[in-house]
Amino acid sequence: MNECLIKNWNSVVGKEDHIWFLGDFSFGKYEETAEILAQLKGVKHLIVGNHDRKGRAEKLFNRDWENWFVDKHDYYRLKIGEYKFVLCHFPFSSWERGYVNLHGHLHSLAGYKNKWRQYDVGADANNYTPLLMEDAWNRAINGEKSVDFY
């Protein structure tokens, strides 16, 4: 499974591309997760998820995060040209006007309906492949539902 995830990732992410992890990256052991991170292309930014603050993930994502990521946030506003995003692990019920809320956390929860201008970018909700920001924007604006695996 890990090989497939790495292949999917590297098929769309280039070495210089900026990529945002929106939390809950791994439940694996430190060494295993570090080995995976080392194989993933891109300039990595971390938005911390609820499972990144405890257990095995705590060391990797709270103490040693600078080995893998250029920065770490709980919440981040990002502007790319005309696209404006609020990034958080958790979906919001309300956010800044004109922005799209990209989130994870739900793990493609059955029956969850994103609000307009909101999209679950979690790997398990998107065929285990990262999305281009433009695609995430369009899916949020068009009210597309994430994949339902449950």
Residue ranges and their predicted role:
Residues M1-D74:
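Core catalytic region of metal-dependent phosphoesterases/phosphodiesterases
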